[in-house]
């Protein structure tokens, strides 16, 4: 019997119970009608005693990172922060490190924490920012067929009312024009981080080899784990085991199973973990309620497969592994 494992589980349970009580007091309509909380202030003044992430899930968007995060934090050695996506390296780098630390748990022996912000992978300045603060951090990337990912992201934007056009083909044409302009006038990219990571860059977000190159300039391959999104559904147990091994964590059999990223099948933990699940759940429902969208036109799929093929081949060469993206229908 592994007594160390049970000790860690008990410690995590006690920590969770404290958060449940604190959450109950904060949300009680009579004891605290205005939901006043010292939580942020407390986190700030105790930031020096808090962990920094041991690993980051940096992308890609619409590729299963929410599912992966929810599975991983079931491990008794992993305590999540106050939120899944902190966006520190994207928007808040002018803030002090204490601000970033304030989002994570108090340091505890044999316990680690993490962050999962899928926009990190495509932002050109983030690799250097992460390396400066977390040079030894481990990085996890989940990659999905870029054709499917682009269509899924487009439909998500349509569902949220954020798309200028609801015609996928028109959207592709517009982005191809922007790519052409950027190639002809590279000076437009100088100091313009939005060029590469702009939220409507459905195609550019799928040029994985280009994004990966930027990360490999700062981090060795040994600190990077690349997962195939399809395996999260077809081969979940092995993927989770591989990830725990990559993180140097003891083996652990997760209890939850997620199909099509429906978080309601996860066993909630309570306290701020419960709030994280609520946040993931509402976000996931919003994003994945668009699964009834029409199928992509066959000619559009063929065009995108041809567009992404050379970038996919470069990626496969970089990682020494092939996915069946070029032939999927």
Where are these regions (language model features)?
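Short aromatic-enriched loop/helix-cap "lid" or pocket-rim segments at secondary-structure transitions
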Residues: 126-127, 150-155, 161-162, 238-240, ...
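PAPS-dependent sulfotransferase catalytic domain
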Residues: 94-106, 163-256, 306
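The conserved 3'-phosphoadenosine-5'-phosphosulfate
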Residues: 2, 6-19, 213-309, 313, ...
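Short glycine/proline-rich turn/loop motifs
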Residues: 47-49, 187-198, 285-300
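Short histidine/acidic/glycine/proline-rich micro-motifs that form metal-
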Residues: 87-89, 117-121, 201-202, 229-233, ...
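Non-transmembrane alpha-helical segments in soluble domains
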Residues: 69-73, 90, 101, 131, ...
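PAPS-dependent sulfotransferase catalytic core
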Residues: 1-121, 132-185, 190-192
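Extended catalytic core of nucleotide-activated donor transferases of GT-like folds
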Residues: 120-125, 315
């Amino acid at each position: 019997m592994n007594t160390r494992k049970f000790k860690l589980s008990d410690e995590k349970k006690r920590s969770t119970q404290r958060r449940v009580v604190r959450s109950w007091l904060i949300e009680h309509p009579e004891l605290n009608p205005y939901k006043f909380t010292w939580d942020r202030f407390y986190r700030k003044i105790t930031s020096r005693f808090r962990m920094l992430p041991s690993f980051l899930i940096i992308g890609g968007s619409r590729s299963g990172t929410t599912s992966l995060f929810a599975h991983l934090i079931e491990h008794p050695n992993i305590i999540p922060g106050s939120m899944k996506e902190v966006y520190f390296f994207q928007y808040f780098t002018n803030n002090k490190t204490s601000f970033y630390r304030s989002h994570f748990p108090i340091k505890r022996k044999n316990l680690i924490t993490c962050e999962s912000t899928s926009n990190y992978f495509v932002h050109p300045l983030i690799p250097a920012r992460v390396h400066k603060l977390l040079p030894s951090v481990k990085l996890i990337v989940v990659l999905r067929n870029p054709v499917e990912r682009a269509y899924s992201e487009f439909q998500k934007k349509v569902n949220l009312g954020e798309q200028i056009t609801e015609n996928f083909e028109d959207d592709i044409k517009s982005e191809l024009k922007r790519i052409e302009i950027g190639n002809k006038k590279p000076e437009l990219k100088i100091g313009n981080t939005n060029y590469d990571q702009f939220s409507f860059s459905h195609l550019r977000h799928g040029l994985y080899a280009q994004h990966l190159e930027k990360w490999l300039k700062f981090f060795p391959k040994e600190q990077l784990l690349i997962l195939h999104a399809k395996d999260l559904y077809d081969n979940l147990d092995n993927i989770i085991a591989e990830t725990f091994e990559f993180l140097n964590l003891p083996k652990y059999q997760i209890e939850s199973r997620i199909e099509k990223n429906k978080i309601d099948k996860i066993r909630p933990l309570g306290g701020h973990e419960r709030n994280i699940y609520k946040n993931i759940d509402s976000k996931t429902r919003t994003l994945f309620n668009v699964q009834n969208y029409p199928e992509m036109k066959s000619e559009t799929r063929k065009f995108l497969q041809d567009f992404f093929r050379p970038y996919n081949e470069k990626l496969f060469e970089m990682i020494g592994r092939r996915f069946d993206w070029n032939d999927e229908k």
